[in-house]
A protein has these predicted regions:
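Acidic/negatively charged segments and metal-coordination signatures
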Residues: 1-255
Length: 255
């Protein structure tokens, strides 16, 4: 059984009225999510979890939080089972970040300010591991690491696990919205080697805009489906069994 269901019912906190995470709280969350000795081997790091949560929130159908947490921690049981205090703190901070993403990606262009614009979480990459001038290894993968690599991979993984993304991906007018995600995940575009991640972060604003545009596209898509599903309304009242026949014969419609 997914233990996150029970935890959420027991700790039902109105996350949406909590203030956005502070820098200190984000640092604390990164630290808790980096506890490789206590967390499952397959658990996501904070950067990847942030990308995964973002894809869930701006995609076709947000994943229920218990299932989302199960995917992030790679287990249906609660993390840090032997330290209830740290467990509580970890889940609280993670769900507040989930709420922060939900709020910032839902803003219209008129509502966005420098203080509330959506920005992905990124972990610092050690200088010795940073990307080099564009080179691929024998597997045609980018050599080195770059900021938001894991974030892009988390977002990409969420898309790959959900076939419901197909309408957006197959739309030639908007399918390119995922291009920044692919670039951050792979470090380069396999179809265009000159398009690559570098150290000037020029793609970061584009990534932010694309993420919010995806949520807007799915909102409009669902509205169009709802409009198409509106049942037919009869233009005139239905003729009753004993009503006069519409042909003006004066006879009853049906005996």
């Amino acid at each position: 059984m997914n233990e996150f269901f029970r935890w959420i019912l027991k700790h039902s906190t109105p996350w949406d009225i909590q203030p956005p995470l502070s820098d200190a709280e984000l640092d604390e969350l990164f630290g808790l999510m980096s506890d490789n000795e206590q967390l499952s081997k397959g658990a996501m790091g904070m950067e990847m979890a942030d990308g995964y949560m973002t894809a869930s929130l701006v995609g076709p159908d947000p994943l229920p939080i218990p299932w989302l947490l199960e995917a992030i921690f790679d287990q249906p049981t609660l993390p840090l089972p032997h330290d209830s205090e740290r467990q509580q703190r970890l889940l609280q901070l993670l769900l507040r970040r989930h709420t922060d993403i939900q709020a910032s990606t839902a803003l219209s262009s008129d509502e966005v300010t420098p203080d509330n614009v959506f920005m992905p979480l990124m972990a610092q990459v050690p200088a010795e591991e940073c990307i080099t001038p564009y080179r691929l290894d024998e597997k045609h993968e980018r050599i080195g690491r770059w900021e938001l690599q894991d974030w892009g991979e988390g977002f990409r993984r969420a898309i790959a696990e959900d076939d419901a993304w197909e309408p957006l991906l197959s739309d030639p007018e908007v399918g390119g919205l995922v291009s920044p995600v692919v670039l951050y995940s792979m470090g380069h575009n396999p179809d265009c080697p000159d398009l690559q991640i570098d150290e000037d972060h020029e793609l970061l604003p584009l990534l932010s805009v694309s993420v919010c545009a995806m949520r807007s596209w799915w909102r409009d898509y669902h509205r169009s489906l709802s409009a198409a599903a509106i049942p037919f309304e009869r233009g005139a009242p239905k003729v009753g069994r004993n009503d006069p026949c519409p042909c003006d014969s004066g006879k009853k419609y049906k005996k």
